[in-house]
């Protein structure tokens, strides 16, 4: 039987589209930014054109991608902000009532990987939270606010078209505010990064209560005639769940420690028994066959990524994924270097397999939709 992915390849030749993928968990400290960077790099290494979008006011993704280590780096980044647009300035025409239309952001190529670009974040992006929240609550009943709910989606679509992007990966802040609601509900797919701990279990439980409310709002907004006729129309609601990522746990003698394994199992059980019913009720799942073809069980765990340990500091220093660090960048010798190179190969395979799953799952959407 021809797989869903192979059937889509014929379709893809005739239809170029960008897939917007949100990495969302309102619990902080789950390595969303690190995963976004490493995954985006891997997708680009497989020939995809990828835009990393930093929507977290902390701007950690921007700092990693642009290498903010020294005073010279800071001066260079300041110059970039003076000469390039970013998430806040890109949306200013809508949110600050400027007499010009939203235009594509002039994204920054990320050094070291062809086809990988950054849409920089901005600390002031959070200033738009209250206004957007009011606009979404009133659902376009106030004419002056009708252009806001569709503005972020419009900016990302225009930017994707300018750079001929295959994927947009959205690094989101740990919150349940209006901006995250908008980003998630106007994405095509979403991933839920987690860590093996009690608070990730709580976060998934919370997400299962939040999603129905957000989905109901998005469906209403997508058919609201005022929002559909706005300068930046609110898009159709087509969000689908890709899966979860469990990460940042410790390995001893090739296996998760008992404590971490216990929390991994609790996360998977919470997904199966609490999140999955909500996903089904709100039509947020792809056909079951699509997940099965990728070897995913009912817990929807896409991959498990152990702690990067000392490699993460080197990765951030060189603005390079852990698996792509060179011998010169490792600056190590002997058994330490050998051990880290072995870990690099493990991480490379992990992210390669994850990227392949995402390509297959996201590509299946056009067939299953």
Where are these regions (language model features)?
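C-terminal lobe/tail of nucleotide-utilizing enzymes
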Residues: 2-11, 225-369
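Conserved catalytic-core segment of NTP-binding enzymes
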Residues: 21, 45-48, 147-280
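Walker A/P-loop phosphate-binding motif and the immediately C-terminal alpha-helix
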Residues: 17-57
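Phosphate/oxyanion-binding active-site loops and adjacent basic polyanion-contact surfaces
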Residues: 32, 141-152, 200-204, 343-355
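Active-site signature of alpha/beta-hydrolase-fold catalytic machinery across serine-
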Residues: 38, 42, 64, 182
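Phosphate-binding loop that captures ATP/GTP phosphates
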Residues: 58-118, 223, 227
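Cytosolic-facing regulatory segments adjacent to core modules
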Residues: 93-112, 117-170, 176
């Amino acid at each position: 039987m021809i797989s869903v992915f192979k059937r889509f390849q014929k379709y893809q030749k005739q239809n170029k589209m960008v897939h917007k993928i949100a990495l969302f968990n309102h619990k902080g400290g789950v390595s969303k930014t690190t995963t976004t960077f490493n995954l985006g790099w891997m997708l680009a290494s497989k020939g995809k054109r990828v835009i990393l979008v930093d929507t977290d006011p902390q701007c950690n993704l921007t700092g990693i991608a642009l290498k903010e280590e020294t005073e010279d780096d800071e001066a260079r980044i300041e110059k970039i902000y003076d000469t390039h647009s970013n998430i806040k300035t890109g949306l200013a025409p809508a949110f600050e009532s400027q007499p010009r239309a939203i235009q594509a952001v002039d994204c920054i190529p990320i050094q070291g990987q062809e086809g990988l670009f950054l849409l920089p974040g901005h600390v002031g992006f959070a200033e738009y939270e209250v206004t957007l929240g009011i606009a979404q609550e009133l659902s376009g009943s106030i004419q002056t606010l009708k252009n806001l709910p569709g503005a972020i989606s419009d900016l990302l679509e225009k930017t994707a078209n300018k750079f001929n992007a295959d994927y947009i990966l959205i690094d989101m802040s740990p919150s349940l505010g209006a901006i995250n609601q908008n980003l998630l509900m106007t994405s095509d797919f979403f991933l839920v990064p987690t860590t093996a701990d009690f608070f990730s279990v709580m976060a998934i439980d919370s997400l299962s209560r939040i999603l129905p409310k957000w989905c109901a709002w998005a469906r209403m907004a997508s058919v609201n005639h005022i929002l559909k006729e706005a300068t930046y129309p609110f898009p159709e609601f087509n969000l689908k769940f890709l899966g979860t990522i469990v990460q940042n746990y410790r390995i001893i003698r090739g296996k998760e420690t008992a404590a971490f394994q216990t929390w991994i199992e609790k996360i998977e059980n919470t997904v199966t028994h609490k999140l999955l019913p909500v996903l089904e009720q709100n039509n947020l799942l792809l056909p079951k066959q699509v997940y099965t073809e990728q070897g995913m069980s009912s817990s929807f765990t896409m991959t498990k990524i152990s702690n990067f340990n000392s490699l993460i500091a080197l990765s951030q220093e060189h603005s390079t994924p852990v698996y792509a660090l060179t011998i010169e960048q490792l600056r190590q010798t002997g058994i330490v270097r050998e051990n880290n190179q072995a870990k690099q190969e493990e991480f490379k395979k992990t992210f390669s397999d994850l990227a392949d799953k995402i390509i297959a799952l996201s590509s299946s959407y056009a067939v299953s939709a």
